């Protein structure tokens, strides 16, 4: 019968103690970025930017690759979140207080959002006529350009971003398994379809 070993401690320290090509299977659920603060110095998931978090995750997975046998597999559980201000503070207040960009409101890592092409920013076009008020609203004809920002309430797509970062580092992403949770925590947002 095969022995199962559970290693507890800092992931980078525990992985460095392990020999190359010694693990058949890794099952991991690393801390999701910006969602839990365990009040522990250097904790994974509390990096100032998503780019720093993804860089750290790729570095950790390089150590996992080193200890994984050529026939080994990795099972990764990584959750998502929505772009919002933490604890009700605005993005500007949070950044001013702690130089922290985990609010997602003004981060240059997404290709969606309100970053507009200045060449089109001043032109406007009619959008909708309101027969009750007699007013015609206008909208900017500016175009969103690559390098834009996530908007409030956007799904951040963190698992996808991590999967792409790992693919870029040479990992294979073989499948995505949706974890159906029949008794999941209720979603009180009221502005989006529940994910379960």
List PLM regions with ranges:
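Core catalytic lobe of class I
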Residues: 2-196
């Amino acid at each position: 019968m095969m022995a199962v070993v559970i290693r507890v401690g800092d992931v980078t320290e525990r992985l460095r103690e392990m020999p190359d090509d010694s693990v058949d299977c890794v099952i991991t659920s690393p801390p999701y970025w910006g969602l839990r603060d365990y009040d522990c110095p250097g904790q994974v998931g509390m990096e100032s930017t998503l780019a720093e978090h993804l860089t750290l995750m790729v570095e950790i997975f390089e150590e996992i690759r080193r200890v994984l046998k050529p026939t080994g597999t990795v099972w990764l559980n990584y959750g998502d979140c929505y772009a919002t201000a933490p604890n009700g503070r605005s993005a500007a207040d949070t950044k001013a207080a702690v130089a922290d960009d985990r609010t997602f409101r003004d981060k240059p890592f997404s290709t969606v959002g309100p970053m507009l092409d200045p060449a089109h920013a001043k032109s406007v076009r009619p959008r909708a006529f309101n027969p009750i008020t007699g007013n015609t609203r206008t909208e900017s004809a500016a175009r969103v350009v690559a390098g834009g920002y996530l908007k409030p309430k956007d799904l951040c797509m963190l698992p996808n971003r991590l999967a792409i970062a790992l693919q870029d580092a040479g990992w294979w992403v073989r499948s995505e398994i949706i974890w159906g949770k029949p008794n999941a925590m209720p979603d009180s947002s009221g502005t989006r379809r529940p994910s379960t």
